[in-house]
Amino acid sequence: MSFSICLIQAVAFLDLLAVGLIVPLVSGHVRKMGGSHLYVGLLGSIYAGFQLGSGPLIGSLSDLKGRKFILIMTLLVCSLSYTVMGMTNSIIIILMIRGLLGLFKQTQMLTKALVPDYERDPHKQGEIYGKMAAISGAGITLGPMIGGHIAEDDPDNGFTFIATIVGVCFALNAGLVYFLPKSNKPVKRKPKISGEKRNLSYQLMTSVKQSFAVLYQVKWSKYWDIFMFKALVGFAMGVYYSNYSLYLKTTYELSPKYIGYVISFQGVIGSVSSYFIGYINSFYTHDDDYSLRNFHVFLLLSISLLGLLFSFNVMMYAVWLIPLAIGNAIGRLVTLEMILKRSHNDHRGTLIGASNSVRSLSGVVAPMVSGFIGQFYGISYVIYASLCSTLIGVVMSYHYRKRRVK
């Protein structure tokens, strides 16, 4: 493996390690500053909303200006943003920073886009992507544990210290990318465009419009039920994870250190489940349309959420996290496979794009719903919204399965 690929993998690892350090602590920090659950919900919705439009924008800029240059610039913006987040005492500024991060935090996408610039063999590229996923998964698993320990050892200044570390990590990543050798792959040159189209806000709005345009192109009469399954899984997990840390802290009085352990534990289970997806599929040799697997996913998620709801201690809670993580990991893959299976290669790219847009829209709506419930009914009631979503999925997937069998 070349030195350049090793550098790219190191950047991908350090990126998710840094994110894992701080993201689980942000909601608790905002609550400590006096922010309501609605503000906590806004944190997730603002980030997801900007991510919805920024992917095509950053990708287009990287084609125009060069992936290495754009990656360095975005990493430096993220470095400054996280550092300021740790120093500010204003919730409004934190919300603005989340929007800025949603716009510029595209490290994983850009590192994947950089791989073909330094490795031309398609077969080796697939192997590199697999290793990158495993290495990045290790980063997001270690991050919450380390961040939790630091936050617990220094409750007053721990968040500021962690934010500074995260800022340094992103700056270090920018330095690593700088040392990548110059790629021989030519940068695309676009024809000159008007001043209006050079404006970043215009390009962002164009990207958002393109996301909705993709949704408009889909024949919903043919695919609506599968996209509904996708939305139900995304909404259920989005609502649940939006107040995950606060729920553990409020219900079980866990310290940041142990919250980090629980988050890392669930991440490991999800990674292992994704790794063994081929083995899991071997039990469904006659389930050609994925309808049975889809029904089992919603059933597993519903049972898991019920188990979490009635858990009387954190050990029982951790046990029920295992089937929840498995169901979530498999569910993301099953809904995509159902879409591709029904498409018969017709508009496959459009359908994948629409699937991602549905997931992104769920990511925008879910945190706000979670924040609203937490604010007006209590944090312990948030999980009921996730349970309702998965139970609707159980009923729909059961009827879907019956129709397919007939």
Locations of regions flagged by a protein language model:
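Juxtamembrane intracellular "pre-TM" segments in multi-pass secondary transporters
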Residues: 2, 183-228
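Hydrophobic core of transmembrane alpha-helices in multi-pass small-molecule transporters
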Residues: 13, 81, 92-106, 231, ...
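Residue-level signature of mid-helix packing/kink "hotspots" within the transmembrane helices
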Residues: 20, 48-56, 106, 140-141, ...
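Short amphipathic helix-loop junctions that connect adjacent transmembrane helices
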Residues: 24-38, 242-258
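Conserved MFS/SLC helix-loop-helix module at the cytosolic interface between two early adjacent transmembrane helices
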Residues: 52-90
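Helix-to-loop junctions at the C-terminal end of transmembrane segments
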Residues: 55-66, 151, 274-288, 374
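Structural signature of the two symmetry-related core transmembrane helices
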Residues: 69-84, 291-307
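Cytoplasmic helix-loop-helix junction between adjacent transmembrane helices
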Residues: 97-136
